[in-house]
């Protein structure tokens, strides 16, 4: 077993995105909960995968936090590493990969559709996909629903009022008003405990 060194996580995500004893009450919708021993904010799938791989190697407990919706945290906090997906660099006007939204409209060329669907290994869906939306795990469902509606697309309205992130919604198959994530998802990237990224 290796010894946990916070410097390794700082090398992966940057020193400014690692905090010690961060109050989790600031990151949950109920505004309760003690501090996380370490609070880390990756902004790409690669950074998240590298963090998970390292934490598994040193056998440090970790938890992925999206929007913190309906999450209860004990007053004692969390004696491990919280990997938060809720980071957005507003000062620089940049959006990290985990918060990006890409919409390929229905009038996109067949070549564009094939290229995008091949990226996710689902080229066989080309005949059934009218429009394509790709979004990171940290994207708020309300934001995604609004962006999709702004493009004149339908089918994701059910998620507009769900107070969570896309990553959490996929994990638990969130739904409302007769719609569910399983009804609209074509493919997903998943990071396993060894830090490998898979397409499903």
Regions found by a protein language model. Name each.
Residues 2-166:
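Anion-binding (especially nucleotide phosphate/pyrophosphate-binding) glycine-rich loop
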């Amino acid at each position: 077993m290796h010894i946990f060194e916070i410097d390794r996580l700082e090398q992966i995500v940057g020193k400014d995105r690692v905090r010690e004893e961060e109050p989790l009450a600031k990151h949950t919708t109920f505004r309760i909960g003690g501090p996380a021993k370490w609070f880390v904010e990756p902004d790409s799938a690669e950074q998240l995968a590298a963090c998970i791989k390292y934490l598994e190697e040193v056998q440090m407990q970790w938890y992925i936090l999206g929007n913190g919706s309906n999450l209860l945290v004990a007053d004692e906090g969390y004696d491990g590493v919280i990997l938060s997906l809720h980071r957005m660099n507003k000062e620089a006007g940049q959006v990290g990969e985990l918060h990006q939204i890409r919409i390929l409209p229905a009038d996109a060329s067949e070549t564009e559709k094939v290229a995008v669907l091949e990226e996710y290994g689902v080229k066989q869906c080309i005949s059934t996909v009218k429009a394509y939306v790709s979004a990171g795990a940290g994207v708020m469902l309300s934001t995604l629903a609004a962006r999709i509606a702004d493009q004149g697309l339908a089918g994701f309205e059910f998620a507009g009022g769900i107070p969570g992130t896309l990553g959490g919604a996929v994990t638990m198959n969130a739904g409302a008003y007769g719609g569910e994530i399983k009804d609209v998802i074509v493919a997903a990237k998943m990071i396993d405990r060894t830090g490998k990224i898979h397409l499903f």
